[in-house]
Amino acid sequence: MNKLYFRALRLSIYGFLAMAALLFVPAGTLDYWQAYVFMAVFVGGSAAITVYLAIKDPKLLERRMNVGPTAEKEPTQKIIMVFALLGFIALLVVPALDRRFMWSSVPAWVSVLGDILVTLGFLLVYFVIRENSYAASTIQVAEGQTVISTGPYAVVRHPMYAGVLPLLIGTPLALGSWWGLGALIFFMPALIWRLLDEERFLHKNLPGYTKYTRKVRYRLVPFVW
C-alpha cells in the first residue's frame, strides 16, 4: 500500500514540474499571476481526488494512475491518447505564448471565472469516481464490473468526460488567453473519438451496456448529445 502512495506522490510531483515548465518557459517570465492561481487550483483539485481515492478506494487510484498512450491496449486508443496529450499540452503552451507576446487581453474576472470552471470540472470528476469504482483511465472491462446507472450516470453515459469539459474550457481562460481556446480544436475531436470508440468497446464487452444506452439517451451533454 505504501508503494501505491509513493507512486501517487511521485507522479504528482512530476506532473507539477511538467506543468510549471509548460507554462513558465514559453511565457518567458515568472511574472504570470494567472499561471500561479491556475496551478494552485489544478494541483489542489488533483491532490484532493488523489487523497480521497487513497483513503476510500486505493484500487481505483491504482487504475487511474495507469494512464497515457502506452497504458492503452487498443491501437486506436493509443493514437487517440497521443492526440489528447498533445491537445492538453497546447492548452497550456498557447496561453503561455499569449502571455509572452501579448496576443490578447483577458479581464481578471474572466480568469477567475476560468478557475471556477476548472474547480467545477474537478468536482464533477469527484462525483463520478465516488459513484463508479471501475472508472479507470484506460478503456477496459475489469473482472466483476457491472453497468453503473445511478448518480451522474443517470444523466449522461460519460459523466467523466462531461466533467472534463468545463476543466478544458476553463484552462485557457484561467491562464488569461482567448487564443488558448483555439487549442480545443485539437482536444475535442480526440475526446469525441475516444468516447465513441469506448461505447463500441462497451457494447461488445460489458453485459447490460446496450440496455443502459436505451435508458440514458445522452452521451455527454444533457438534451444536446
Which role does the model predict for each range below?
Residues M1-T150, A162-W225:
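Membrane-anchoring alpha-helices and their flanking helix-loop junctions
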Residues A154-A162:
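Histidine-centered phosphotransfer motif of kinases
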